[in-house]
Amino acid sequence: MPSDDQMLLIRNYDLWCNLSDEDYKDLNIEHHFIEVPKGEYIYFEAYNHNKIYFVKEGYIRIGYIDAAGNEKVKEIIQKGELFGQFTLEKNNLHGEFAQAYKHDVSICAFRIEDFEKLLKKRPDLALRYSKQVGAKLRTIENRLLNLLNKDVKTRLTHFFWQLVEQKLGENQPEGFCIPNYLKHEDIANLIGSSRQTITTMINELETDGILSFNRQQICFLNVKKLQKLVSVN
């Protein structure tokens, strides 16, 4: 793909929308566009890693291997989001993996050193980036607090409410819908439960007319009712 087309693609996203041609070249992104087939790992057991990744298309599964040798998902990264060494610290991904999930994905990568130079040069970009990282860290903190203080049903309703707040998808005749990139097992891993428990509770939410859940999409049929469940807990 010509570099002009690559630059146009990345400039479609808020974080990068004001990049100059010179800024773009400083990141060396044109040398690091990557197409990753579904199921392949972008990195695995990343002990010496100095890259940040930006998702142009698709979903990335971030996880780790537990003591029993099982893969555990801790985050699903979507189009327009960053992953990797997003705190700009080297070697803080011990035991973490990143895997192309659901479909083939398109990402770009750049070195921490190049990005830090650009942040020093462009304080407006540094501010936007710090806000994005801050929001990401708050999400992680809230998830941890929920794990410590909430029961499974409350954690599940908070998880779905988080999806509503992200305002993904479009308003559909049957309600607000988002593309579904999650299996019951993924949700179980993300909120600290079992697949069987999550399946039972999703069935209850469907019976109550709050949402519908299938492989293609999640539809929130009664947002006010879901919000009430979240506010009560």
Regions found by a protein language model. Name each.
Residues 1-38, 82, 87-88:
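Cyclic nucleotide-binding regulatory module and flanking cytosolic helices
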Residues 23, 74-134, 138:
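Cyclic-nucleotide recognition modules
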Residues 39, 50-63, 79-80:
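Glycine- and acidic-residue-biased ligand/ion/polar-headgroup-sensing regions
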Residues 42-47:
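Short phosphate-coordinating micro-motif centered on Lys-Gly-acidic
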Residues 67-74:
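Short alpha-helix-to-loop micro-motif enriched in aromatics/charged/Gly
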Residues 124-190:
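Polybasic "coupling" helices that flank or enter modular domains
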Residues 165-233:
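Phosphate-/nucleic-acid-contacting segments
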